Swiss-Prot record:
InterPro entries: GcvP (IPR003437), GDC-P_C (IPR049316), GDC-P_N (IPR049315), GDC_P (IPR020581), PyrdxlP-dep_Trfase (IPR015424), PyrdxlP-dep_Trfase_major (IPR015421), PyrdxlP-dep_Trfase_small (IPR015422). This is Glycine dehydrogenase (decarboxylating). Signal peptide: none annotated. The glycine cleavage system is composed of four proteins: P, T, L and H. It is an enzyme of class 1 (oxidoreductase). Its EC number is 1.4.4.2. Gene3D superfamilies: Aspartate Aminotransferase, domain 1, Type I PLP-dependent aspartate aminotransferase-like (Major domain). The lineage of its organism: Bacteria, Bacillati, Actinomycetota, Actinomycetes, Mycobacteriales. One of its GO terms (biological process) is glycine decarboxylation via glycine cleavage system. The modification N6-(pyridoxal phosphate)lysine is found at residue 692.
Length: 941
């Protein structure tokens, strides 16, 4: 860490002199000395003879950026970029270069976090409101959330939403036989642990006999067939059931939307709106409902409120539905889903407008009609949008081979049927190759009269004003300027690990060799991607000490869910399906409890001591009480209190002795890599957050990847997939076999360039920075928890409860005031109300960490003035924060502090000024007056 000659030196923000400065403040002699004092001796790995950490010593030596990119290029070149006409929910598309450059390749967008601090997140909140408007307009429903993980999980959430909304004892749902196979598989995964019975039927004939809480159909179906589901909706409603329709948004520019035929829920994906297939992801799924079901929606929901000056402003609405508050009673276990991809899809719609989208849809449909016309009597359905199904008795393999020989992949339904899907990238030449593969001549196009939509859509200015590249470029810049992302400032969010997302790591994700791969393409087309997946799995095994890894979960929440399902299936395989108790410490993140509930488990809370550690006596008592039914313990390590618990080995042993499994939540793995391996100190399963520890950017709230790592006895129960026989036989949790595969090169590049030494140094540096902050700020804000030697892990919790009691100043006041100092706030009131959890990561420099500390010290001085009575508690720079340029330029200024104190509390030279777009937002107003779609914010003035 001296001459910045290696990637690790550039990734890690501290050079050797800065490390020495921090260690002196902490009071330790070296990084290794810090590790010995912070990490329990019983789990701390001893370096091997090679000087590397066990496991990591088998990683390949660190590569330079150029070397890693050359290796990635070789992997990319091992793929074949065929023309995909497979369809089945994944379609080729053209990403407008202005969106590629200004969103996907722009750190102002991809390095942002979930917009929990709305005053400094107005840009992406507006973009997400555009996304919600896109979905509601096209589906004909009233409320949509801010994205789902993919279409399959959106379908699963639609199913459970209908079950909640039905509020009855019935636990049966009927699914149309023409729903996408992968969607049906994810539905089956979700239904089983919840005791929901799925009945599969051809719903064109109406509902089967019996009681159902809901029905699920597809529009168009997997076969390409378009069905008018209005009669089904009426029949279902007459029998007290709800209806969810998986709808193709591009098709909905032409055909009547689900909301207009009376459907209660619509779900699907926005992938074909400019988002590459990416071997399965990431893509932004969607979920839309009638307004009466708004509180049943899972995930994030952006709404409009007002700030303290009455200015309209955006915020996350109805957060009391979510897992971080309601825990096992939440509507879902998902956090934010696919924000970056939702923004891309929304801006694709904005760039094309209603007319442009309709033109694309008509062109796609025209190509399908051309193929249908040539197929003649071989055509199975006469109502279709983009996909035609052909009857070819005994010739399916021959047709596929002929098309493949000319660079096109079709979809084999069975030995007698082939389907062909057209998309935005389809050309007349492609159509000619397809016809040749079928052995038919071109003919007059068929005319499938499908244009049944009469309602307008996307009439809001957000979808009419940005049709030129100049206007779109400036719009995206204007939105980004309203936000704080890592390109402007350290984001010290505890439990979030907002580290550098290096350009070299990001570069390859836009390569067509990765982006234009269909997840169900022939394996021979994706040899390079499959090798990359295998590399990454093997490296994560070495890093974690487990035996097998699945990369399918496309979020940490889904990794949790997959791990718990593996535990459940393991117990069932041993004749113990009754084991359904999941022990969870009171300090745990709410996602743990929500995931356990989704996996069909009953949550029993384990107490924690005042110092934050798990109460071992209470754990043993509850293990004993529930020994016969004990399934698992979920525990985060290091703990959510930011310390290494010294009893972790005893905790794991107590659970194992009773026949339970130990789930070690990997959210804080950034404090373990190269130091300790959960698979070796007692864990049976962990999920990892590649978007935290392993450098996939947060994207403003997604994408993420949440691999699940297990010991050998759980490996057979890892997620499988109906179209991936090479995977284990477990239940799929995502639509695609390898989840969000196209962003895996980011983590591959990070590990490849860091090497064993760099990975360990990253962990040690993150711990160093956190302990340095704890030492510097402890006299101003007491550090709530430390380990046995007075050390924290990679984050620390600052306790403001005493300050609040004495002065009335709250964590919310401090968080908002930090924006005036140019910083994003730490995590508020988690895991303890009235506290701030700070995580600096290894990527920040000493200067940036010191600036944050100076800001916090400056804020404490302001708090003291309130406490001394110099400023009233209801009128001071903290309570008035954040301050916009508009409020400072107002002719009237009747506050006891000056405008200069408001805007530049440490002077104009402190750091570049961040101007919040709005003042403090009234959350309660937004929930009482729920508005979750456009027009843009100015229209509410």
């Amino acid at each position: 860490m001296s001459d910045h000659s290696t990637f690790a030196d550039r990734h890690i923000g501290l050079d050797s002199q800065a490390v020495a400065t921090m260690l002196a403040v902490i009071g330790v002699d070296s990084l290794d000395d810090l590790a010995v004092k912070a990490v329990p001796a019983g789990i701390l790995d001893t370096l091997t003879d090679t000087g590397a950490a066990p496991g990591l010593d088998s990683l390949p030596p660190a590569a330079s950026e150029a070397e890693a990119l050359a290796e990635l290029r070789a992997l990319a070149d091992a793929n074949t970029v065929a023309v995909s006409m497979i369809g089945q929910g994944y379609y080729d598309t053209h990403t407008p270069p202005v969106l590629l450059r200004n969103i996907i390749e722009n750190p102002a967008w991809y390095t942002a976090y979930t917009p929990y601090q709305p005053e400094i997140s107005q840009g992406r909140l507006e973009a997400l409101l555009n996304f919600q408007t896109l979905v509601t307009d096209l589906t004909g429903l009233e409320i949509a959330n801010a994205s789902m993980l993919d279409e399959g999980t959106a379908a699963a959430e639609a199913m459970t939403l209908m079950h909640r909304a039905a509020r009855g004892p019935v636990k049966r749902v009927v699914v149309d036989a023409d729903v996408f196979t992968q969607t049906a598989a994810v539905l089956a995964t979700r239904a089983k642990p919840l005791g929901i019975e799925i009945v599969t039927a051809d719903l064109r004939a109406g509902l089967p006999d019996g009681e159902f809480f809901g029905a699920i159909a597809q529009l168009p179906g997997a076969s390409g067939r378009i069905t008018d589901w209005s009669a089904l909706v009426q029949q279902a409603h007459d029998r007290g059931a709800l209806v969810a329709v998986g709808a193709d948004l591009l098709a909905l520019t032409l055909i009547a939307p689900p909301g207009e035929i009376g459907a209660d829920v619509a779900f699907g994906t926005t992938q074909r709106f400019g988002v590459p297939m990416g071997f399965g992801g990431p893509h932004a799924g969607y979920l839309a409902v009638h307004a009466k079901h708004a509180r049943q929606l899972p995930g994030r929901l952006v709404g409009v409120s007002v700030d303290s000056d009455g200015t309209p402003a955006y915020r996350l609405a109805l957060q009391t539905r979510e897992q971080h508050i309601r825990r096992d009673k939440a509507t879902s276990n998902i956090c934010t889903a696919q924000v970056l991809l939702a923004v891309l899809a929304a801006m694709y719609a904005s760039y094309h407008g209603a007319g442009g989208l309709t033109a694309i849809a008509r062109r796609v449909h025209a190509h399908a009609e051309a193929i249908a016309g040539a197929l003649g009597d071989a055509l199975v359905h006469d109502k279709y949008f983009d996909t035609v199904l052909a009857r070819v008795p005994g010739r399916a393999d021959e047709v596929l081979a002929r098309a493949k020989a000319n660079g096109i992949n079709l979809w084999r339904v069975d030995a007698d049927h082939v389907s062909v899907a057209c998309d935005e990238a389809t050309t007349d030449t492609h159509v000619a190759v397809v016809l040749d593969a079928f052995g038919v001549a071109a003919a007059a196009p068929a005319h499938a009269d499908i244009a049944t939509r009469t309602s307008e859509f996307l009439t809001h200015p957000a979808f009419t004003q940005y049709r030129t590249e100049t206007s779109m470029m400036r719009y995206l810049r204007a939105l980004a300027d309203k936000d704080i992302a890592l390109d402007r400032s350290m984001i010290p969010l505890g439990s979030c690990t907002m580290k550098l997302n290096a350009a070299a790591e990001m570069e390859s994700i836009t390569w067509p060799e990765f982006g234009r791969q269909h997840p169900f393409a022939p394996a021979s087309d994706t040899a390079g991607l499959r090798q990359l997946v295998a590399d990454l799995q093997s490296w994560l095994v070495l890093i974690t000490g487990y035996d097998a890894v699945s990369l399918q979960p496309n979020a940490g929440s889904q990794g949790e869910y997959a791990g718990l399902l593996a535990i459940h299936e393991y117990h069932a395989s041993r004749g113990e399906p009754h084991r359904d108790i999941c022990l969870i410490p009171s300090s745990a993140h709410g996602t743990n409890a929500a995931s356990a509930a989704l996996a069909g488990m009953r949550v029993v809370v384990v107490d924690c001591h005042d110092n934050g550690d798990v109460d071992l006596d209470d754990l043993r008592a509850k293990v004993g009480e529930h020994a016969e039914r004990l399934s698992a313990l979920m525990i985060t390590y290091p703990s959510t209190h930011g310390v290494y618990e010294h009893d972790i080995a005893e905790i794991c042993a107590a659970v194992h002795d009773a026949g339970g499994q130990v789930y070690v939540d990997g959210a804080n793995l950034n404090a373990l890599v190269g130091l300790a391996r959960p698979g070796k100190f007692g864990g049976d399963v962990s999920h990892l957050n590649l978007h935290k520890t392993f450098c996939i950017p947060h994207g403003g709230g997604g994408p993420g990847v949440g691999p699940v790592a297990v010991r050998a006895h759980l490996a057979p129960f890892l997620p499988g997939h109906p179209f991936a026989p090479e995977l284990p036989k477990g239940y799929p949790v995502s639509s695609a076999p390898y989840g969000s595969a196209s962003i895996l090169p980011i983590t591959w590049a990070y590990i490849r360039m860091m090497g064993a030494e760099g990975l360990r140094a990253a962990s040690l540096t993150a711990i160093t920075s956190a302990n340095y902050i704890a030492r510097r700020l402890d006299e101003y804000y007491p550090v709530l928890y430390t380990g046995e030697n007075g050390m924290v892990a990679h984050e620390c919790i600052l306790d403001l409860r005493g300050i609040t009691k004495l002065t009335g100043i709250t964590v919310d006041d401090v968080a908002k005031r930090l924006a005036d100092y140019g910083f994003h706030a730490p995590t508020m009131s988690f895991p303890v109300a009235g506290t701030l959890m700070v995580e600096p990561t290894e990527s920040e420099s000493l200067a940036e960490v010191d600036a944050f500390c100076e800001a916090m010290i400056g804020i404490r001085a302001e708090i003291d003035k309130v406490g001394a009575g110099e400023w009233p508690v209801d009128d001071n720079p903290l309570r008035g924060a954040p301050h916009t340029a508009q409020c400072l330029l107002a002719s009237d200024w009747d506050h006891p502090y000056t405008r200069e104190q408001a805007a530049y509390p440490l002077g104009t030279a402190f750091r570049p000024k961040v101007w919040p777009a709005v003042r403090r937002i009234d959350g309660a107003y937004g929930d009482r007056n729920l508005v979750c779609s456009c027009p843009p914010v100015e229209a509410f003035a």
